[in-house]
């Protein structure tokens, strides 16, 4: 970030001397973009492209800037122009996929999404067995393998029962913390943790390729909720303070490895606007470093029960969520877990959210129990929490009347 900040005056001086130097406009635009100064970036992309429209990489970056402003159709046009100039351009196809998916065009979006395997940071698995094409393979053994984050695995494991109808034996390779939870998903014959020796199989498919293979549209998303459940053997019990009428689980930070994490995660202090609502007990669903933020809350830390020492895997988290009335979370695996369990969950979204939450709607076709609270401008969490506080107070009032 510091290098981009230092580069801005250099490129500005260059343009003062040579205002028609397209590459300087592109470099300045990129530096502004990396500083989240999106309007300045867009202005210089436009000036530079008017001078030289032949760089596919610039159309790609311009599209990303437009998407960050919520101008999705303009962004799609930029990605398509980048592909016109350079048809075999994996990053442009990938960005186009994410934009089409966010727009709700799942068939075309998931078709383009297959280009992810051409990206340098996303190499495909090298199996001798063929990729499954979606056809009926009764009697065959299929391997479904997780490929991205924990939330992705929870979201797309919903396809296991559909695959089971077409194949004889379903093996799922997934992240170790999910193994016990996924034993409750129907259609799975065998679970293997990532890194363990795989059993014999005939065909394979990555989990996030299943919507493409099965021709999913917005209208045909398999959303039979719940499709995971709390294992019956689990006995983790929540303590509720005296006078508690409503139990709410909260999560405010996702994985720091996610490239969008600085936009989707937030400071725990924002939740303090909810802590004065009487009759509500709050439970932290965070694990590891974000849970340490609780000690900085001062007076408010008494309002939140820190469960991090009890949450060893997703079965533990599922046992807690099952006892809650509501989950309020940023876009993280907790949102997917609560949604897959059918628990009411309010998901707090940044202005340009992940593709799966679409745009301009409060509901999710993936999770019927989800309600979406969106930023109305980039970085504006204050208005989001004002709406959440109002909605939580109204929900409590409704519950008291029942």
Q: Which residues does each predicted region cover?
A:
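Alpha-helical solenoid repeat scaffolds of the TPR/TPR-like class and their adjacent stem/linker regions
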Residues: 1-326, 331-402
């Amino acid at each position: 970030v510091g290098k981009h900040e230092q580069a801005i005056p250099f490129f500005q001086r260059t343009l003062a001397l040579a205002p028609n130097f397209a590459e300087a406009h592109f470099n300045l635009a990129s530096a502004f973009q990396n500083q989240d100064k999106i309007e300045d970036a867009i202005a210089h992309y436009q000036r530079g492209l008017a001078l030289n429209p032949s760089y596919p990489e610039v159309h790609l970056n311009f599209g990303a800037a437009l998407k960050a402003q919520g101008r999705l159709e303009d962004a799609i046009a930029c990605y398509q122009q980048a592909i016109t100039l350079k048809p075999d351009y994996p990053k442009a196809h990938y960005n186009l996929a994410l934009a089409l998916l966010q727009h709700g065009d799942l068939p075309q979006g998931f078709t383009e999404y297959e280009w992810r395997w051409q990206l340098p940071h996303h190499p495909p698995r090298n199996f001798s067995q063929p990729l499954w094409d979606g056809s009926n393979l009764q009697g065959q053994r299929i391997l479904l393998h997780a490929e991205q984050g924990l939330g992705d695995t929870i979201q797309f494991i919903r396809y296991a029962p559909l695959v089971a109808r077409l194949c004889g034996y379903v093996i799922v390779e997934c992240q170790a913390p999910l193994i016990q939870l996924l034993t409750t998903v129907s259609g799975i014959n065998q679970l293997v943790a990532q890194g363990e020796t795989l059993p014999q199989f005939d065909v394979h498919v990555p989990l996030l390729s299943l919507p493409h293979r099965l021709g999913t549209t917005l209208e045909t998303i398999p959303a039979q909720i719940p499709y995971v459940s709390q294992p019956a053997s689990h006995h983790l019990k929540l303590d509720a303070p005296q006078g508690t009428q409503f139990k709410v689980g909260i999560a405010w930070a996702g994985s720091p490895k996610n490239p969008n994490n600085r936009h989707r995660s937030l400071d725990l202090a924002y939740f303090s606007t909810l802590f004065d609502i009487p009759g509500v007990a709050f439970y932290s669903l965070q694990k590891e470093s974000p849970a340490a933020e609780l000690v900085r809350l001062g007076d408010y830390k008494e309002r939140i029960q820190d469960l991090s020492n009890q949450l060893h895997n997703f079965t533990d988290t599922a046992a807690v969520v099952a006892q809650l009335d509501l989950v309020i979370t940023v876009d993280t695996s907790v949102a997917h877990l609560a949604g897959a369990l059918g628990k009411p969950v309010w998901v707090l979204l940044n202005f340009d959210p992940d593709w799966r939450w679409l745009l301009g709607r409060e509901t999710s076709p993936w999770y019927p129990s989800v309600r979406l609270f969106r930023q109305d401008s980039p970085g504006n969490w204050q208005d989001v929490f004002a709406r959440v506080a109002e909605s939580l107070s109204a929900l409590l009032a409704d519950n008291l009347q029942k």
